[in-house]
Amino acid sequence: MQEYNQPLRIGVGGPVGSGKTALLEVLCKAMRDSYQIAVVTNDIYTQEDAKILTRAQALDADRIIGVETGGCPHTAIREDASMNLAAVEELAMRHKNLDIVFVESGGDNLSATFSPELADLTIYVIDVAEGEKIPRKGGPGITHSDLLVINKIDLAPYVGASLEVMEADTAKMRPVKPYVFTNLKEKVGLETIIDFIIDKGMLRR
């Protein structure tokens, strides 16, 4: 018999270095006073992202579980999500009134998607440093995620990327789905992401 609330599960995906862990850090710090939050991270051989969040004091250590997938990170969030589902359940049992569990995928490519059994909402993170062509390359992360985060806009002048081109391409690839340009170091765009989570996740304000 289930003796805990079913939290909102938010999958956070994106290529290595795009800013997934940085996003989770700022989200947790901004939302933890209003909501009960926990995090599951995925790494192939280590628990490095979990350690980063713990060191940053994003949440108490008992609210973070690092899953070592030991293989293709896509499989652990899609075809066989059992390890992640078990981690979510463990966190929900530890903290009976959880509102949100973020599930961060291991570094993946544009074709990775979350199993609907694992994530109620999905956020996909790309970054400007990968080049302005990234949005038009498509893939499920770009086209099907519930929210697309285009991070590190401050780097655009240094990598020769046009934010105007990126926005036009993103609008073509996601004509009815939301996206946001961010600089997470300066918290630019953070409130838009929080509002999306609250509204789409039907959380209390």
Curated annotation (Swiss-Prot):
- InterPro entries linked: CobW/HypB/UreG_nucleotide-bd, P-loop_NTPase, UreG
Q: Which domain of life is it from?
A: Bacteria
Q: Which Pfam families match?
A: cobW
Q: Where in the cell is it found?
A: Cytoplasm
- Return the protein name: Urease accessory protein UreG
**Database matches in PANTHER family:** UREASE ACCESSORY PROTEIN G (PTHR31715:SF0)
**Residues that hold GTP according to the record:** G14, P15, V16, G17, S18, G19, K20, T21
Q: Give the primary localization class.
A: cytoplasm
GO biological process entries: urea catabolic process
One MF annotation (Gene Ontology) recorded for this entry: GTPase activity
Segments traversing the membrane: none
- Which Gene Ontology cellular-component terms appear in the entry? cytoplasm
Summarize the subunit comment: Homodimer. UreD, UreF and UreG form a complex that acts as a GTP-hydrolysis-dependent molecular chaperone, activating the urease apoprotein by helping to assemble the nickel containing metallocenter of UreC. The UreE protein probably delivers the nickel.
Species in which this protein is naturally found: Proteus mirabilis (strain HI4320)
